[in-house]
Amino acid sequence: MDNTNRLRHLRSRKQSKFTLGDTAEVNSVKWEFINMTEQEEDLIFRMHRLVGDRWDLIAGRVVGREAKDIERYWIMRNCDHCSHKRRRVHKFYRFSISPP
């Protein structure tokens, strides 16, 4: 019986160590707003309407983009928490492009 308790204790220590490492990795990622062209945005919105959150399938249609980039773009584009980054990026591009 003593041996089974020791195995349970070891297993629970490994599990807790594993989960702590995962959260530290996720929290350390710095997200910056991803700039997409109008064609890429349009394609992402249309594909999302058709297939939903299947980011790997959508990334196969958008040339040069990975599934994680498209998912991050979608989250940042549609969440209220990231709206201040959107405004700052669009404001920068609006004033940096001169009219024809």
Curated annotation (Swiss-Prot):
Transmembrane segments: none annotated. It is found in: Nucleus. Pfam families: Myb_DNA-binding. GO terms for molecular function: DNA binding. One of its GO terms (cellular component) is nucleus. GO terms for biological process: negative regulation of DNA-templated transcription; negative regulation of trichome patterning; trichome patterning. Keywords: Developmental protein, DNA-binding, Nucleus, Repressor, Transcription, Transcription regulation. SMART domains: SANT (SM00717). Expressed in cotyledons, petioles, rosette leaves, hydathodes, cauline leaves, stems, pedicels and flower buds. SUPFAM superfamilies: Homeodomain-like. CDD domains: SANT. Interacts with GL3. Plants over-expressing TCL2 does not have any trichomes on rosette leaves, inflorescence stems, cauline leaves or floral organs. This is MYB-like transcription factor TCL2. It comes from Arabidopsis thaliana.
